[in-house]
Amino acid sequence: GYGYECDNNTIRNCKLGPNVAAEHVDIKEYTTGTTVENCTFDGTGMSGENYAKSFINIKGNDCVIRNNIGYRNGCTAIQRAIEQNNVADGWGQNAMVYGNKVYMDTATNALGKKMYFLNAWDCSATVWDNFMAYDGELFSVDNEDDQWDYYNCNLLTYGNK
């Protein structure tokens, strides 16, 4: 295993990809305070190893995901931009996700399901100022009336812009 005392890490100004085997960033359970900011994710050649389906997988608490850009680039392994999981009781909570832009190529994934910006069932997240493009221009995904179009999250809060 790995050491669980891996808190308050910052991943900043990185270009990750192409040819990444699994998620570009995988924030593990039992970690707190991870920040991922100002990074670029290139999905080209991602193999989807270990069931990877997103640019970022959040399993830790109190994470900040901000000002990143993700390009799916036709990679069928990427089925959503960000995944948030509670694989251990009390974990995968309190994420702040804002100022991100993702280019997903299509509105549906390889399984014919909706291409969500954030998939985070039973995980709390606060979001604002996020944008997505399917096959064209970026659009805001932060309209509360359309939450279920872009955020598959039953514990979602919209923050202030």
Can you name each region flagged by the protein language model?
Residues 1-26, 31-46, 53-55, 60-74, ...:
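Right-handed parallel beta-helix
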Residues 22-26, 47-48, 53-55, 76-86, ...:
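Structural detector of coil-to-beta-strand junctions
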Residues 144-146:
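A short, acidic, flexible beta-alpha connecting loop/helix-capping segment that sits on the rim
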